[in-house]
């Protein structure tokens, strides 16, 4: 293996995505990252590679990764990788990175990714930006992003013309957005939140031409210092906001009677076939658990219908739902910012409007 020097930036080329799989099923975040990685690779004029680890890896789904943008897929198949361990996965991924030298490494900000990413960054002596919500290498595209998401006077601000990865993430509890670069070290590493990147349509031609390459790992049982004895799935059922077709979200506007407000939201979600979401104010108050939270510090959703009940429309919340197909806002304040992004708006008391809405929907279904 050639000597690895994280500061020899010119030696690194290509965009990589760690494609997480569980029990033989590729996770949705992997397709999202491949779709985003494809854009970055196109802007840089380089190859996009997916990396898959596991035991008894199904080669059929490896080809499918090409349909979401991968030019090449490296896969590592070993009984020692059947269950995730920090030692095993970090060693194998770091060894491969040191050999192939990608300039960008993207990992999903899942429980697994949040453990694996920083471990690898530390071993490789490079930086990692966690929980990213936006990525750019093209300065012009980054400027366009800033024009729509910030108050920066882009046209009168000087930007360095380079292809460093610009990694944007929430900071200070979601009150600010910070863009971080890693100009002196490679690879540039980022973990990306599930749901913030859109998955591109499957491309049969891409799946047909992707190159699948098996890698034999230099991994032994002695390299793994933790033994997985058993895996138990949580009995707690978490709300699936990201996969929902309809989301009914509640905000600070339910503060007059939180219990009643949430009950109305649940009933409306029930008749619409959706799930209940919330703004940060609601989860911070303890009215709903954190898995219901939508926004920069919560989940990013793209449902067919998003109903905002008593949500003012703070930029941190809007960032997590503005790409919904149809946004219906109900708020007493006619000047609430939520109406700026709403497809349909109702100015009124949600405690009066929602029961009528539920009644009309039930009547229409009868």
Q: How would you label these PLM feature ranges?
A:
Residues 1-366:
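N-terminal glycine-rich FAD/FM-binding segment characteristic of electron-transfer flavoproteins
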């Amino acid at each position: 293996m050639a000597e690895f020097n994280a500061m020899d930036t010119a030696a690194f080329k290509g965009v990589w995505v760690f494609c997480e799989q569980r029990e033989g099923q590729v996770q949705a975040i992997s397709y999202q990252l491949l779709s985003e990685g494809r854009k970055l690779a196109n802007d840089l004029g380089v190859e996009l590679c997916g990396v898959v680890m596991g035991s008894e890896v199904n080669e059929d789904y490896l080809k499918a990764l090409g349909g979401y943008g991968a030019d090449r897929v490296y896969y590592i198949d070993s009984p020692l990788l059947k269950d995730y361990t920090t030692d095993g996965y970090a060693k194998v991924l770091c060894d491969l990175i040191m050999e192939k030298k990608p300039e960008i490494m993207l990992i999903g900000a899942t429980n697994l990714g949040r453990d694996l990413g920083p471990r690898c960054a530390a071993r490789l002596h490079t930086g990692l930006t966690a929980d990213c919500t936006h990525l750019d290498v093209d300065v012009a595209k980054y400027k366009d992003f800033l024009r729509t998401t910030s108050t920066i006077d882009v046209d009168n601000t000087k930007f360095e013309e380079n292809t460093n990865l610009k990694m944007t993430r929430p900071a200070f509890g979601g009150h600010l957005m910070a863009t971080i670069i890693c100009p002196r070290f490679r690879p540039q590493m980022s973990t990306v939140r599930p749901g913030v990147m859109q998955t591109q349509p499957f491309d049969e031609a891409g799946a047909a031409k992707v190159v699948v390459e098996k890698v034999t790992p230099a991994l032994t049982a002695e390299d793994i210092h933790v033994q997985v004895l058993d895996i138990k799935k949580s009995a707690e059922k978490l709300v699936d906001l990201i996969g929902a077709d309809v989301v009914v979200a509640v905000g600070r506007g339910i503060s007059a009677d939180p219990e009643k407000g949430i009950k109305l939201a649940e009933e409306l979600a029930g008749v619409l076939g959706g799930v209940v979401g919330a703004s940060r104010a609601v989860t911070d108050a303890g009215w709903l658990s954190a898995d219901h939270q939508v926004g920069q510090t919560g989940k990013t959703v793209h449902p067919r219908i998003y109903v905002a009940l008593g949500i003012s429309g703070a930029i941190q919340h809007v960032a997590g739902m503005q790409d919904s197909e149809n946004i219906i806002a109900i708020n007493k304040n006619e000047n609430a910012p939520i109406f700026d992004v709403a497809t349909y708006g109702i100015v009124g008391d949600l405690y009066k409007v929602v029961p009528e809405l539920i009644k009309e929907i039930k009547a229409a279904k009868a």
